[in-house]
Amino acid sequence: NSNKTPLIIRWPGVVTPGRIEDRAMVSAVDFLPTILDILSIKAPYKLDGMSYKRLLYGKKWRGPEYVYTHFTSNSGQYAEPMRCIQNHDFAYVFSPWADGEREFKSETTSGLSFKAMQRAAVSDSTLARRVHFFRYRALEEFYDLRKDPDALHNLIEDPDYAPQIAVFRKAMEQKMVESGDNALEAFRGRNDSAILQRYIAAQQTKADGYKENKRKSQNKK
C-alpha cells in the first residue's frame, strides 16, 4: 500500500477535471521524462523512466509492465534496504537485511497504533504473528494483490505460485541491472548469508557516514 500512492495532476485545458486513471502505473522516475516531453526538450542522456504525456491527454498509453521501488534506510540512518517490483496483480519484495535477528526500525513502531497492536498480540495469536512479521519481515515476500490487496499473506513458499515468483525474480534482477542497483550482488547471492551480511554491513557503514557528515554540518551552523 505504501507504493500505491495517488498522483494528482491539475492542468487546465488538458487534464479533464475529475478524471480517474486506475489502471495506469507510474513512478517518480517517470516525472522528468514527462516534463521534458511536454516541453519538447530532448533528454541529454537515457533516462530510467518513461513519459506519460499521452496519458495526460487522455490517449492510449502503454505504460511500464512493472513498477520498481526501493528503500535504503530510515531517518535515523539505520540500514534497512528493501526492493519491490509489482504490477496490478502481484508484488515481490526483497529485504536483504531480514535475517530473523535484525529488527525493522521506524517511527511507526513508536506510535500508538503499533503499541496497541503489541498489547493486543498478547492474547491474539494471529495479531502476534503479524507484529512479529512487521518487526522482522522476511528475505523474500510475494503477494497476490488480486486476492490479498493489503499484502497480509506471504506466498513465497507456496508451490502454486512458483511460476509467477520466478517471473518476478527475473524481472527484479533485470531492473537492478538496468538501474545499476548496488543490491544486485546481494540479490543474486540471496541464499548465501555471508554475502547478505557483507552487503548490510557495507550499507550500514555508508549510512553511519552520512549521519556523521550531517551531524558535522549541523554543528557548523
Question: Which residues are covered by each model-predicted region?
Answer:
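Substrate-binding rim/cap in mid-to-C-terminal beta-strand-loop elements of soluble/periplasmic
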Residues: N1-K46, M50-G63, H153
